[in-house]
Amino acid sequence: MALSLSQDRSFDDDDSVDGSRPSSAQAAFKVPKVPKKPAESASSSRRPSATGAAKSGASKEGAGAVDEEDFIKAFTDVPTVQIYSTRDLEDNLNKIREVLSDDKHDWDHRANALKKIRSLLVAGATDYDCFYQHLRLLDGAFKLSAKDLRSQVVREACITVAYLSTLLGNKFDHGAEGIVPVLFNLIPNCAKVMATSGTAAIRIIIRHTHVPRLIPLIASNCTSKSVAVRRRCYEFLDLLLQEWQTHSLERHAAVLVESIKKGIRDADAEARVEARKAYWGLRAHFPGEAESLYNSLESSYQRTLQSCLKSSGSVASLPQSDRSSSSSQESLNRPLSKWSAAPGRVPAGSKSSGSPASLQRSRSDVDVNAAAGAKARHSGQAGGAGRVTTGLTPGSYASLGRLRTKQTLSTASSVGSSQVDSRGRTRSKMASQSQRSDDSDCTPGSQSATPVGAGSRSGSPGRVLASTALSTLSTGAQRVSAAPGSHRRSRIPRSQGCSRDSSPTRLSVAPSNISHIYNGSKGARGSRIPRPSVSQGCSREASRESSRDTSPVRSFTPLGSGLGMSQSSRLSSSVSAMRVLNTGSDVEEALADALKKPARRRYDTYGMYSDDDANSDASSACSERSYSSRNGSIPTYMRQTEDVAEVLNRCASANWSERKEGLMGLQALLKNHRTLSRVELKRLCEIFTRMFADPHSKRDPRGFGTVESGISSASFKRVFSMFLETLVDFIAVHKEDLQDWLFVLLTQLLKKMGADLLGSVQAKVQKALDVTRESFPNDLQFTILMRFTVDQTQTPNLKVKVAILKYIETLTLQMEPQDFVNTGETRLAVSRIITWTTEPKSSDVRKAAQSVLISLFQLNTPEFTMLLGALPKTFQDGATKLLQNHLRNTGNTAQASIGSPLTRHTPRSPASWSSPLTSPTNTSQNTPSPSAFDYDTENMNSEEIYSSLRGVSQAIQNFSVRSQEDMTEPPRKREGDGGEETVDSGRTALDNKTSLLNTMPLLSSSPRPSRDYQPVNYSDSSFGSSSFNKSLKDADQEESLTDDSGVDQSEVVAELLKELSNHSERVEERKAALCELMRLIRETQLHVWDEHFKTILLLLLETLGDGEHVIRALALRVLKEILNRQPWRFKNYAELTIMKALEAHKDPHKEVVRAAEEAASMLATSISPDQCIKVLCPIIQSADYPINLAAIKMLTKVIDRLPKEGLIQMLPEIVPGLIQGYDNSESSVRKACVFCLVAIYAVIGEDLKPHLSQLSGSKLKLLNLYIKRAQSGSSGSDQSSDVGGQGL
């Protein structure tokens, strides 16, 4: 059965909904509504016409699409208006700006306002000087309109800015710079009218506004993850190189070279075509740079460039079917492809306008029912309908293989060539960055038919086995013949199960042979009933039958019988030596591994697109990922990915598959020792912090893995496992820069040890903990662990407690005695650990806590003794009992241990202490905690022991008295307890470490000072560091103190934070919580804030984005209050806090803006001036109104705090932004710049003058006037009115 011409449509013929083009010829050709023969289409001109009529209208782009011709018609298709005066024009423009700046106006009003701008332009608005001033003010309105959700508003906005560019040319430079990034965001839009409007507007701007600053804006999008955006970018670069003069390009020649270089290596075939066209445009302007670029390319890319030059010159250098589409909503109703073949490339007998359909895959991201319907409609296609005969299996693509050898491919005498890349597999339609092309990208109609699973996306082990055993792959051109009546399926595969093409039917040439081999399928053809696509979630079992490379069929199908191929050819040595597995055991191993892994979800990412699964989990032994895992090499596409921002974007993606690939890219960068900048580090730490919060347990309560969730829980665990691997590399490379993040890292890893994780994942968490322990300073880790132990916001479960204790215990083995510091936080932590020795629910916790106490005692005996002396009697009794029991149990004391108190004991035996941080449920049985120490009392008689005990008892009593004071101060003499003599005698006794093990029993009978610290309740659930520290500092004024108030305050703060985390919910409750928090700031002791400050700051900054303006204003006032009372805490958060405070000035509510101004003013007086200036200067130069205004005002306050010498050094950073602001269209910004310059002059005097050389004479005169007024004592209000009067 042959398909009729009218039915033969490709799923990819039409443009994707993200705005991608149907072929590389889009910018140059107008496709008529009636399909024409391919020969008629290839003779068109390569370049667009001067009017920009690159037709991409409805006939080509689909319903709703617009092009430049439509724009040109719409420019003047507007109501007629008349301009009577300058005032009349200003009134009209002000009304227009008011309507466009408020998206609450009805959408048709906004569309009419945009049309009215064009009406005014037609009426001659450009002849009025005031128009250009108002045009600057309209920038924000244009941006807002281009972002509108209504397509009609977006279309009118694009037409209007295009018309402005056409009329004003380079005078539209400022507007073009602002609007182009917004227009780029329209390109991947699923609404064609939006996507094509943005594209047409950018084209017109490029043609008429030749501003060099546009080049970086375009080039920055060349690394977009959207394939549609990248294609357009290279097309725009080509247009720009064609239209602009060389002098306009010179400044950014390096950017152009680098962008084109990336494009030539792009993963998308069509993007590569556009980049190659741009290369020849670059060569016309900069032959030297182009030559250098050419020489830096690999030979395969050089050949491709040359072959494109030698070709017909037509843009149709690629068949339309050889392209990718990133759309997840693409329509199945496609028009006929115009570029099915280029004339002269394919023998006439093999030409057919229906060929693309025979080479397309089904799409799993579209409606499966529609795909199944399309399959049914095309099921009777005959053998002669396409360029390639029966040998081409479903899923074949226009450019199926890439050959890396230097052999010239013969396309004149053969229908297609079978090319094998370095993987020893055929190449799918979408080329990854690791698959370098030769000339098939550039050769229309050079379809290849590969014998082994032609066109499938990954070479499974089975394919390699088949190719090796049967020797059916060849390095040269292979002919594929077919009898007219040969048995074959339709080449329109259906979406089945978890992949776009079911494995059993890939090799559909011999169904009878397949059916009895592949046991997992229900026959070679499979069911026509559509199954849920992977985007709806698929289980591992489902993927067995339908994933793209889990079928054993490919390795055993008798290819020769169905394909009529020559089996005498051999794999080239270069291919087989690199990638082909030659041993059967390797193949079996890899096949088993591949069968265990589920299919990869389809999506589009940088360098690895939907049809390239070189890195999918289901990839086979010959894929990049599995190959690199055996050989330790890094995948090629990862080696080429140097765009860290792109990698970080993927790591931060909500899509778990993208996140996985982002982590892989990050791993590759880290293994190449690519260091990250401070900003990149900060962002990556934030991303990792969020990843820790994601669910990864074996039994997650949120129901992941359902159809609704779209991804199985196994995927979460795989990504988390990869995250842990990346984390280890990240710590190893950047450990010197991560000390500020260590608290989050360490605490989150310890929490994960208490989660219900798989054994393999838990082992990776353990490895990360081991690396962390070895990478950071011991004293810093110890301080963090102490803080974490007493953190009131944490409620660790039993496993987490064991993990914390084991980590502390292991850490003490590598700590030096001086690393143990006796602080209030440490005393609290030790108290809590003592309570854990009586944990009723877990013997593991009890044993681990006992081991930690003994380890700490062993680490620094004098300090630990002092610490115990500061604790309440109940805690001393518990520690005494533990240590005494330990001594009795061991019965041994090493004589060598008697000596200096700073001498470390012999490390614990490896047999019992080798891995204290293994699984929390198993370690305690393997760790005989107290008995592991080797103490020896045989050489000491009882009199020595008891005399030592008496001395230590007195010393501890003395330390108990001193515990009310700061332990860092020298000991004070106290009447009645022996003064310094007692201390000395105690220290002498401390020299004998063994004696301390028997010291504690005497404490119960010895008298204690009246000011002993005796908390009422020191239970596990109520530790309060604030009252404890207060008692240490204020003991001389208070006779007794309980820690109830401290516990209450800390608990109150924790409850408030919990309430504040309900973003955009429970408004009244959160208002009350913020008010209470402000009260606590004024009353609470600082030690409570030691625990909670970071959490409070994070929540406050997040609350600034709340939906309620009252909440936003309150959050700013709380922030201001903290800044007022505890400014030193913001040292490490200055940049983030300043940015958030400045952004709050954009708030539409005046109450929030006032609060933001107060917070910014407090920041200017609280944060270090140097820090402020480093943050503010870039903002002043780059931010828009009103953020730049707020930054300038803040800078003015900061300048008042700077000394003359420091300010003079910083002038090169400060003054350029102020001079730029002096020209701002907003009068308030100009005023603020003048006041700031006056403030600078007040500090440094005439030293400012040399930096003002760029100012015009009138502006200098005006500045001098206000400097004189300031010197004469004019008030700020007078200055404000005067400056306004002078027309600043």
Curated annotation (Swiss-Prot):
Name of the protein in question: CLIP-associating protein 2
GO CC entries: basal cortex; cell leading edge; centrosome; cytoplasmic microtubule; Golgi apparatus; kinetochore; microtubule; microtubule organizing center
Region TOG 1: start-end pairs: 62-312
Membership in a protein family: Belongs to the CLASP family.
Positions occupied by motif SXIP motif 2: 527-530
Top-level division of the source organism's lineage: Eukaryota
UniProt biased composition (Polar residues): 406-421, 468-478, 496-518, 891-900
Pfam families hit by this protein: CLASP_N (PF12348)
Known function: Microtubule plus-end tracking protein that promotes the stabilization of dynamic microtubules. Involved in the nucleation of noncentrosomal microtubules originating from the trans-Golgi network (TGN). Required for the polarization of the cytoplasmic microtubule arrays in migrating cells towards the leading edge of the cell. May act at the cell cortex to enhance the frequency of rescue of depolymerizing microtubules. This cortical microtubule stabilizing activity is regulated at least in part by phosphatidylinositol 3-kinase signaling.
Residue positions of motif SXIP motif 1: 490-493
Annotated organism of origin: Danio rerio
The keyword Repeat appears for this protein: yes
SMART domains listed in its UniProt record: TOG
Composition bias type Low complexity, residue spans: 19-32, 40-62, 317-337, 347-358, 616-630, 912-931, 1019-1030
Disulphide bridges, residue numbers: none
Entry domain remark: The two SXIP sequence motifs are important for targeting to the growing microtubule plus ends.
Principal location class: cytoplasm
Segments of skewed composition (Acidic residues): 1036-1046
